[in-house]
Curated annotation (Swiss-Prot):
This is Bark agglutinin I polypeptide B. The lineage of its organism: Eukaryota, Viridiplantae, Streptophyta, Embryophyta, Tracheophyta. RPbAI is composed of two polypeptides, A and B, that associate into five different tetrameric isolectins. The A4 combination is the only one devoid of agglutination activity. Isoform B4 displays maximal agglutination activity. Keywords: Calcium, Glycoprotein, Lectin, Manganese, Metal-binding, Signal. Mn(2+) binds at E157, D159, D167, H172. Glycans are attached at N148. The keyword NAD does not apply.
Length: 286
């Protein structure tokens, strides 16, 4: 019965993903505002990515967000990676908002399954966004746990440690809007060392942000969604990327590795990425 439920849910997720992807392709016919890239694996020399703090690419082409020494993750590590080219998430002239899809695979592995911390996050942020000094439960996203609309951040978190002040019980996925306290969460049965495949989509017409995670080898899947008005939360131009942290004590550690990543956005009638300079933005400035 569990297997049937898994297959049914994942058939729905696959159909949803394919349908939304082709909708983006069709809409691009009448669109000049888009960003598209794909990293089947990563390279040591990756000029189209911005690396912050501990993040790096390993010799095996893995995007390692937090530090690993001699095969063991290090505590109090924090790292972020952003795609260098900004993209237009909404157009102040037309009022149009972009739709987007992204997919990536990651592995979180902990020496002790009962002591994991802290998490991995996909996020959108202002072009000049820098990584806060605080890691741990704030996941390299925010300076503190309070809501602040000036943060201008939307994120999907994969959180492996419960911070009592703002987290629900247990390991979870969450959607964050300007605060580390998620607007929507779902329980996530994290699988130690297993490859997780993630698909995230935003449909501008419905303002629906949806995230799904599948462990193909374990027949486990998870999905959550929330209504988020990106035009009210984010600036007109943003960058997209990942952030991750480990715990603040040496017992609570984990790896945070991204294996592959693709992204596609569509803004009807917007500016192309090549027009970024006309907006007064630098394509590759951190």
């Amino acid at each position: 019965m569990a297997s049937y439920k898994f297959k049914t849910q994942n058939s729905f997720l696959l159909l949803l993903s394919i349908s939304f992807f082709f909708l983006l392709l069709l809409n691009k016919v009448n669109s000049t505002g888009s960003l598209s890239f794909s990293f089947p694996k990563f390279k040591h020399s990756q000029p189209d990515l911005i690396f912050q703090s501990d993040a790096l690419v390993t010799s095996k082409g893995v995007l390692q967000l937090t530090t690993v020494n001699d095969g063991r993750p290090v505590y109090d590590s924090i790292g972020r990676v952003l795609y260098a080219a900004p993209f237009q998430i909404w157009d102040s002239t037309t009022g149009n908002v972009a739709s987007f899809v992204t997919s990536f695979s990651f592995i979180i592995k902990a020496p002790n399954e009962g002591k994991t911390a802290d998490g991995l996050v996909f996020f959108l942020a202002p072009v000049g966004s820098t990584q806060p000094l605080k890691g741990g439960g704030l996941l390299g996203l925010f300076k503190d746990e309070s809501y602040n609309k000036s943060n201008q951040i939307v994120a999907v978190e994969f959180d492996t440690f419960r911070n009592v002040a703002w987290d629900p019980n247990g390991i979870h996925m969450g959607i964050d809007v300007n605060s580390i306290q998620s607007v929507r969460t779902v329980r996530w049965d994290w699988a130690n060392g297993e490859v997780a495949n993630v698909f995230i989509s935003y449909e501008a017409s419905t303002k629906s942000l949806t995230a799904s995670l599948v462990y193909p080898s374990l027949e486990k899947s998870f999905i959550l969604s929330a209504i988020v008005d990106l035009k009210k939360v984010l600036p007109e131009w943003v960058r997209v990327g990942f952030t991750a942290t480990t715990g603040l004590s040496e017992d609570y550690v984990q790896t945070n590795d991204v294996l592959s990543w693709s992204f596609e956005s569509n803004l009807p009638g917007g500016n192309s990425v090549a027009s970024v300079k006309n907006a007064g933005l630098s394509t590759y400035a951190a």
